[in-house]
Amino acid sequence: MFGIVILAVYAVLMIGVTLMFTRKTTDAEGFHVADRRIGSAIAAMSIAATWIWAPSLFTSSEMAYTRGIPGMFWFTVPNVLCLILFIPFAKRIRAQYPEGITLTGYMAERYHSGKVKGVYSFQLGALAVLSTAVQLLAGGKTLALITGLPFWSMTLALAAIAYSYSRFSGLKASIITDVVQLGIILMGGALLVVLSLRMTGGFDTVRAGLGAVSGEYTSLTSSTGIEVLLGYGLPMAVGLISGPFGDQCFWQRAFAIRRDRIGRSFFAGALLFALVPICMGTVGFLAAGSGFVASDTGMVNFEFVSSLLPTWVLVPFLFMIISGLLSTVDSNLCAAASLTTDWLGIGKDTVQTSRRTMLCLLIVAIAIANIPGLTVTYLFLFYGTLRASTLLPTVMTLLSKKLTGKGVFAGVLTALCVGLPIFAYGNLAGIPAVKAAGSLTTVLSSGLVAIIASRKAVKA
């Protein structure tokens, strides 16, 4: 009953905020890019909240607890850097395609290629589905553990909440709720860290846990540090650095923010985001330093807080977790909805189709999240590598390098058909070197094949 009440209160809060600060939108410009009027402060909070997905709330604690300093480093630093590196490219796409809505639309216009539009639509659409599945998987596990209700019912509840307000005004609803959600996350995280420090001996316990619960992960350059680099750090860095480039959520915000505020918005968003893995990672270090034994390391923050702090602390903790998960889910819904404009054009009918697209995405994501044995970390690493498949062709296009539509299509297709399976095999077989090779192959093959195929097309 406790968990159900929390969900109901949260749903009412998000719907109330949406109704209070936005109006129901029927035009594509307003629904997909918020009339291109978003200011820097609100945009920064929205960017940070959108980037706060399940891994930043759960995996940061897990990495601190199981892999110490190397794990936290390879999770946090690329997460922050990727948003900063994205800034010049966000500015470029806005300058080159000022009335745009999607990355797919930009690439299709540059190359006048249906194949390029198709492969980019697939990559961006698949990413939105898999990213949503991660959020539902992580959130559903937590809520099922607390409420005792079936996991599948919790994934349905989370999906219903996100859809209830996202369908009302599209990106406007996503952004205004992002502001509230980020506030909940930051205040909740600060509360958990302060209370946990008081109950475990303070920063001495944090220092004791820097080497993880095993005490073996104290350095980036040690044998265990190199092991983390190959098995986790390199695939994570590749996936994260390419993150915004292969995610329509961030291109959509680049088109929605006031043109002169893009740079400062993404920079501030990166700094705001950094506070979250730092807070949750501290909880992981405290758990390790205090000798806490987690039954599920992927849920170590929840288990540790539940065992250490008063029951009432679960209320802000749950609000924080739900906010982090749904801030990404609603952004994914808006991103997938915006892709309809590439195929149907802009009009009132497009908005109705966009709302139906949101529902379709949720149905597929719920099905994936309910696959037995699926873990947050595996799914996150997989779709992180998927994002990398379009990184180099996108960057080279924005930098005005000489590519052709056939070259771009061949490059992305090669990355998807060669690099991604290699990574998937390494991930399933638990072979760090193969995972790293798969990540690098995905990134590099798309660019190299695009260049080679483009030159051949020009010569022909």
Regions found by a protein language model. Name each.
Residues 1-460:
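Membrane-embedded helix-loop-helix hairpins and adjacent transmembrane boundary segments
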